[in-house]
Design a protein with these regions (language model features):
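Short intracellular "coupling" helices and adjacent cytoplasmic loop segments at the cytosolic face
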Residues: 2-13, 113, 121-145, 149-151, ...
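ABC-type nucleotide-binding domain
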Residues: 349-350, 356-604
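Transmembrane helix-loop-helix hairpins at lipid-water interfaces of multipass membrane proteins
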Residues: 36-100, 180-185, 283, 294-300
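Juxtamembrane loop-to-helix connectors within ABC transporter transmembrane domains
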Residues: 20-21, 29, 108, 128-172, ...
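Alpha-helical segments in transporter systems
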Residues: 26, 34-59, 90, 105-109, ...
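Helix-loop-helix
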Residues: 67, 178-192, 262-335, 340-341
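An intracellular "coupling" helix at the cytosolic face of ABC transporter transmembrane type-1 domains
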Residues: 31, 132-133, 151-158, 162, ...
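Transmembrane helices of ABC transporter permease
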Residues: 31, 35-48, 59, 160-214, ...
Length: 604
């Protein structure tokens, strides 16, 4: 992915509602009202002291010139005492200005970092209250970007733009007032330089922008080509495409070179052009100032002060343009943060939740209807009773609604109609955390985090002892392979857990479910990622584990669920058949067709 653009072609991200976002941001800053007021006062003071400095310093220049004149005419000399006092006054002003600027920056840094700290905490807490629907609708990268990039962009944008906006506006107005006080005619000449510079800069920006856009496109293309070639290096080599791939890369690289050269060349023209125009303005001002000084309208020191102000006049204008970009970027980031914080949350738990400490495992589905989009239900009218301790297998083609039923049972989603009961109580009567503690679960997608194998298994029950963790690993047939790894149970898994095989990941997640020792067990494709021998070992362990527990087994490979007490066959969101393995085969219905088709595939 291409990086951010620099130079005149940079196009900042803009918020959809700038005013509304800034209003929310100020509301967030309400608790820091007094420190913010102090920051603004210090910023104004620092700028004001900096503005009056050149005017006071000009009196020293005037005194020096006057003293030289007196000395040459024999009427006196230079009053160094007076000049020294003036210089000390200016030094004191600049020192106070620097102190004000230091404390203003220190206080503002504290405010912005406290705000960032608070927002990260609020986003993290919000994530745990968000419905599963949100995470299935949005990418993981987008959610992570809110808590890292957007919060950082927002806080750094505030630190850079808030005081700069105040100081630069104050500087612009203050410098203009001081220039007018010295000479309105010289000020007029100085102001004429601005539109000339603006016109020339605008023409350069307009011409260079298309090259910056082309540069970014070509940069994205070259990054994509490198990533594609790197990811598919084996395929490139296998088909002897190294030469062709290099030619394609060279063509993109050449386009990037041409567009980058033109954009950087035109961008580089801005500085010499604006410098030339501003220097031309200096020449005109000095010429006019010398004429006015000769007539006694102004002093030599006034000319020196005016040139100083003239140099400072264009700086805040340039910085205000940059601040505008920073504010847009900051507001866009803040808008994304606030949009996330304003997202609808899961319905609150009941005020008096049902006790869940001694759940037996009786589960009932009563006319359940559900759809990820309510207008398109995937579960139509599902009813089923599962007594405690029974093993129920749920089978059916992809999209039949098998995994959806598990999500509803654990309240990752709530039903659109009907109800699900656990031990005779509607699952919505339990607090979500209490309900989910009653489930041990092994999902299709194995999830392990960075840490030791011991820590990953213990995630199922944080208070478990090492001996209990090892016992769970043995029950899941994971102990043998763990002991062959470097470090054994203390081996560190990396962030993606790529230093163990997919089958080993599956065994570790099963060990975690064993350790949880919950009354209800959910196995979603639990043996889909292991070899036949490992699957047999796991199946034996699961048969032992499921005794005395209500177990829901979801599997496409029907050979793994022959021993289930009941098999529910789902099709298009409905239960079309139910019974034991032998009963369903004897009926010769949809289940028998599924089973026979898999058997034929194995034989073939």
């Amino acid at each position: 992915m291409a990086g951010p653009r620099r130079g005149p072609g940079r196009i900042p991200e803009k918020p959809k509602n700038f005013k509304g976002t800034i209003t929310k941001l100020f509301r967030c800053l309400g608790r820091y009202r007094l420190p913010l007021v102090l920051v603004l006062v210090l910023a104004l003071a620092s700028t004001a002291f900096g503005i009056v400095g050149p005017k006071i310093l000009s009196t020293a220049t005037t005194e020096l010139a006057t003293g030289l004149g007196r000395k040459l005419s024999g009427l006196g000399g230079i009053d160094f005492g007076k000049i020294g006092k003036i210089l000390l006054t200016v030094l004191a002003l600049y020192l106070v200005s620097a102190v004000c600027s230091f404390f203003q920056s220190w206080i503002l840094a504290g405010i912005t970092q406290k705000l960032a700290y608070r927002l990260r905490g609020e986003i993290s807490a919000k994530i745990h209250r968000m419905p599963m629907r949100y995470f299935e609708r949005n990418t993981v990268g987008d959610v992570l970007s809110r808590i890292t990039n957007d919060v950082d962009t927002m806080s750094s944008g505030m630190a850079q733009s808030v005081t700069q906006l105040v100081t630069n506006v104050t500087m612009l107005v203050g410098v203009l007032v001081m220039m007018l006080r010295i000479s309105w005619l010289m000020t007029l000449i100085a102001l004429i330089v601005l539109p000339v510079t603006g016109v020339l800069t605008g023409r350069i920006v307009k011409r260079s922008q298309r090259y910056f856009v082309a540069q970014q496109k070509n940069l994205g293309d070259i990054n994509g080509k490198v990533e594609e070639t790197y990811a598919g290096h084996n395929v490139v080599c296998a088909f002897n495409r190294e030469g062709a791939t290099q030619k394609e890369f060279d063509a993109i690289n050449a386009r990037l070179y041409r567009s980058a050269w033109k954009s950087q060349f035109l961008s580089g023209l801005m500085s010499p052009v604006t410098t030339f125009v501003s220097k031309l303005g200096y020449v005109c001002v000095v010429e006019l100032g010398g004429s006015l000084a000769a007539r006694g309208t102004i002093t030599i020191g006034d000319i020196q002060a005016f040139l100083n102000y003239m140099a400072n006049f264009t700086q805040p204008i340039t910085q205000l343009a940059q601040i505008s970009t920073q504010l847009q970027t900051m507001a866009a980031a803040a808008e994304r943060v606030f949009a996330f914080l304003d997202e609808a949350e899961e319905p609150a738990d009941p005020a008096l939740p049902a006790p869940a400490e001694h759940i037996r495992g009786d589960v009932s589905f009563r006319h359940v209807r559900f759809g990820y989009d309510p207008a398109q239900p995937v579960i139509h009218d599902w009813s089923c009773d599962v007594p405690a301790g029974r093993t129920v297998a749920i089978v059916g083609p992809t999209g039949a609604g098998k995994t959806t039923m598990v999500k509803l049972l654990m309240r990752f989603y709530d039903v659109d109609a009907g109800a699900i009961f656990v031990d005779g109580r509607d699952v919505r009567d339990y607090a979500r955390g209490d309900l989910r503690r009653a489930f041990g679960m092994v999902l299709q997608d194995t999830w392990l985090f960075k840490g030791t194998i011991m820590e990953n298994i213990r995630y199922g029950r944080p208070e478990a002892t090492d001996a209990e963790v090892i016992a769970a690993a043995k029950a899941a047939r994971a102990d043998a392979f763990i002991r062959t790894l470097p470090g054994g149970y203390q081996m560190e898994l990396n962030e993606e857990a790529t230093n163990v095989s997919q089958g080993q990941k599956q065994l570790l997640t099963i060990a975690r479910a064993v350790l949880a020792n919950a009354p209800i067990l959910i196995l979603d494709e639990a043996t889909s990622s292991v070899d036949t021998r490992t699957e047999q070992l796991i199946q034996e362990a699961m048969d032992h584990l499921m005794r005395g527990r209500t177990s829901f087994v979801i599997a496409h490979r029907l050979s793994t669920i022959r021993n289930a007490d009941c098999i529910l066959v789902m099709r298009d969101g409905n239960i079309v058949e139910q019974g034991t393995h032998s009963e369903l085969l004897a009926r010769g219905g949809f289940y028998a067709a599924l089973y026979n088709s898999q058997f034929e595939d194995v034989v073939a």
